[in-house]
Amino acid sequence: MILHAQAKHGKPGLPWLVFLHGFSGDCHEWQEVGEAFADYSRLYVDLPGHGGSAAISVDGFDDVTDLLRKTLVSYNILDFWLVGYSLGGRVAMMAACQGLTGLCGVIVEGGHPGLQNAEQRAERQRSDRQWAQRFCTEPLTAVFADWYQQPVFASLNDDQRRELVVLRSNNNGATLAAMLEATSLAVQPDLRANLSARTFAFYYLCGERDSKFRALAAELAADCHVIPRAGHNAHRENPAGVIASLAQILRF
């Protein structure tokens, strides 16, 4: 089994750019940014429980990494960068720390490196279980209306929230819930030590209005790019700013 993805081919000899979306997104999420790099071959992946991979269920990060590895092999991708937002960034960091043959580097936008104590994990598990229950039992429009009121999305205006609620409500609530719990921060290890000892290139992107993840970025041994005029979802709020940072990283 492999993950559903959309592949766009560029010039031979350059590494692939493999894009991983955030929770409730899909393979289209990164395309406005990714298509600015047409010289590179691009793979836009649907993570388990999302988009064309909605029917694929996993028990945890190990399963996701295994699926990602098999997907890369199926496309004969031998040399690549992982580019991930939020959940996709956490998947990218986990997979990279576990080892991926052919990995050039990891570019993470607003991805959490992991909670650092049992109390934080227990609280996160309670929270994610409550959200998962709502995703399973309530209309998605109602759930996402509350989801985007969370502090991490404080930089969004009302119109942006409404647009995201409509977009995300096309998902399957049950499969979102399953993926939310399977890849919860409550079950993700703290990756700070692994990332410090890494053998791959590591870059971190965060919006200038995303105070939480700017603080987290400062804890990581990573080259950090702050995206102007953007909050947590920087590639949606300021795609040109993210394109500029990726171009600098890739020396496009």
Curated annotation (Swiss-Prot):
Disulfide bonds: none annotated. The keyword Amino-acid biosynthesis does not apply. One of its GO terms (biological process) is menaquinone biosynthetic process. It comes from Escherichia coli O9:H4 (strain HS). GO terms for molecular function: 2-succinyl-6-hydroxy-2,4-cyclohexadiene-1-carboxylate synthase activity. Monomer. This is 2-succinyl-6-hydroxy-2,4-cyclohexadiene-1-carboxylate synthase. Catalyzes a proton abstraction reaction that results in 2,5-elimination of pyruvate from 2-succinyl-5-enolpyruvyl-6-hydroxy-3-cyclohexene-1-carboxylate (SEPHCHC) and the formation of 2-succinyl-6-hydroxy-2,4-cyclohexadiene-1-carboxylate (SHCHC).
